[in-house]
From Swiss-Prot:
It comes from the Archaea. Its main location: cytoplasm. Its EC number is 1.1.1.26. PROSITE patterns: D_2_HYDROXYACID_DH_1 (PS00065), D_2_HYDROXYACID_DH_2 (PS00670), D_2_HYDROXYACID_DH_3 (PS00671). It comes from Korarchaeum cryptofilum (strain OPF8). The lineage of its organism: Archaea, Thermoproteota, Candidatus Korarchaeia, Candidatus Korarchaeales, Candidatus Korarchaeaceae. This is Glyoxylate reductase. The active site is at 238, 267, 286 (proton donor). It is found in: Cytoplasm. Pfam families: 2-Hacid_dh, 2-Hacid_dh_C. GO terms for cellular component: cytosol. The keyword Cytoplasm applies.
Length: 332
């Protein structure tokens, strides 16, 4: 008999078909995510769970699923999962790292470019019939990107990928990280500086850190006031890394020139959020990894993690390595 898995959203077929070869599949097909109540109900008899960032997976869910042995996250981040509790219960947690790196870096740079050159504003300007003069020397003035200074906060895989793109634009690249990356300094010519100096000297600041107690609201009023009035902030990491109220104030009052945001403190962003009324911010619906190729590869990685576990092997992308001491891999 195949082990049973609940998949909380319809993911690309390349992954689903592989999962279905090895598991009895229970798939949530609604576009809206299942509520926690629904997850608890559907996972009761499951051996495995495929989750997304919008799914709260905690002790209450684990308690309702005595057979649950693995949670395969369809994402790199996993702050929606109580990993400590999972480990205590001998539940393996996996994710999909690496595969998102290049497409997320593409998107971060796209937000940077769109905000700097006012691309979205210009599009609306044309569509709304406001373009009355063929050309005007002061129309839609933005900021150059080539040759400017980029500050990267978080020099991991994605931060380094953004740096590689910035090199092609002849940019000076500063970075701040909790760990100094001398390997990237040699490879990419990036310069390690304290966060304060990075904020003060950068024309663009791009955030690439995980959400932890240390990074929660690491960009707040104090940090935003340190930035240049002509600077642009880009966030493709986690919404709560930035104090959104302080950011609104900074954009509204002109402490900084603009922002490009793919993530927010509350997702979806409420329709009455004041950020939506500002012209100097480019907004996206947590879509940095949203390419056909990347999302399909993510689905395949989820399947690979599940299938390896079923074979009694340690999954290739295991988050909580210490769980191996609690329970060996497999559905035995």
């Amino acid at each position: 008999m195949k082990p049973r898995v609940f998949v909380t959203r319809e993911i690309p077929e390349r992954g689903l078909s592989k999962i279905e070869e090895h598991f009895e599949l229970d798939l949530w097909k609604d576009e809206a995510p299942p509520s926690k109540k629904v997850i608890i109900e559907r996972v009761k008899d499951c051996d495995a769970l495929v989750s997304l960032l919008t799914d709260p997976i905690d002790a209450e869910v684990f308690e309702a699923a005595p057979k649950l042995r693995i949670v395969a996250q369809y994402a790199v981040g996993y702050d929606n999962i109580d990993v400590k509790e999972a480990t205590k219960r001998g539940i393996y947690v996996t994710n999909t790292p690496g595969v998102l790196t290049e497409t997320t870096a593409d998107f971060a740079f796209a937000l940077l470019m769109a905000a700097a050159r006012r691309v979205v504003e210009a599009d609306r300007y044309v569509r709304e019939g406001k373009w009355k003069v063929a050309w005007h020397p002061m129309m839609m003035l933005g900021y150059d990107v080539y040759g400017r200074t980029l500050g990267i906060v978080g020099m991991g895989r994605i931060g380094a990928a953004v740096a590689r793109r910035a090199k092609g634009f002849g940019m000076r690249i500063l970075y701040y990280d909790s760990i100094r990356r001398e390997d990237f300094e040699k490879e990419l010519g990036v310069e390690y500086v304290p966060l304060e100096k990075l904020l003060e000297e950068s024309d663009f600041v791009s955030l690439h850190v995980p959400l932890t107690e240390e990074t929660y609201h690491m960009i707040g009023e104090e940090q935003l006031r340190r930035m240049k009035r002509t600077a642009i902030l880009v966030n493709t990491s986690r919404g709560k890394v930035v104090d959104q109220k302080a950011l609104y104030k900074a954009l509204k009052e002109g402490w900084i020139a603009g922002a490009g945001l793919d993530v927010f403190e509350q997702e979806p962003i409420p329709p009455d959020d004041p950020l939506l009324k500002l012209e100097n911010v480019v907004l996206a619906p947590h879509a940095a990894s949203a390419s056909h190729e990347t999302r399909s590869r993510m689905a395949e990685m989820v399947a690979e993690n599940l299938i390896a576990f079923k074979r009694g092997e340690i999954p290739p992308n295991l988050v909580n390595q210490e769980v191996v001491k609690v329970r060996p891999p497999g559905f035995q």
